[in-house]
């Protein structure tokens, strides 16, 4: 596959975020358009239907802030259900808790998981093992 360097833009309520880089994969699944782009500053980034999801650069800030406040607020941490999270980052953070014996990740779009495992495996880390 030939990789294409281009600009990808996300638009939201009168604002625009542009990202220049090499498109590693652009695929339409049954549910959405999935893009992984390699950017000089952010590293690899995942976009779904034109919306920024995560990147190597900001992954830890998003997933750590999503998981740790929630899990720190409960005493019994044995089973976790993740709805969405096909990039694996939320599950990766949950794996850090030894009290958790079971993590169920439910993602409607199996292509997001397949693409994340191939192009963004560092984000899922230990969760994919």
Where is each model-derived feature located?
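N-terminal auxiliary segments of SAM/dcSAM-dependent transferases
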Residues: 1-45
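The AdoMet/dcAdoMet-binding core of the Class I SAM-like
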Residues: 2-8, 54-129
């Amino acid at each position: 596959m030939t990789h294409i360097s281009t600009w990808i833009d996300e638009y939201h309520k009168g604002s625009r975020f542009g990202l220049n880089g090499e498109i590693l994969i652009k695929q339409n699944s049954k549910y959405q358009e999935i893009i992984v782009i390699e950017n000089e500053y952010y590293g690899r980034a995942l976009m779904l239907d034109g919306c920024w999801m995560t990147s190597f650069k900001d992954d830890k800030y998003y997933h750590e802030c999503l998981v740790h406040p929630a899990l720190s607020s409960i005493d019994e941490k044995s089973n976790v259900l993740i709805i969405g999270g096909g990039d694996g980052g939320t599950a990766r953070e949950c794996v850090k808790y030894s009290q958790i014996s079971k993590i169920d990740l439910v993602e409607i779009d199996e292509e997001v998981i397949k693409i994340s495992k191939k192009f963004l495996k560092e984000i899922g880390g230990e969760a994919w093992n």
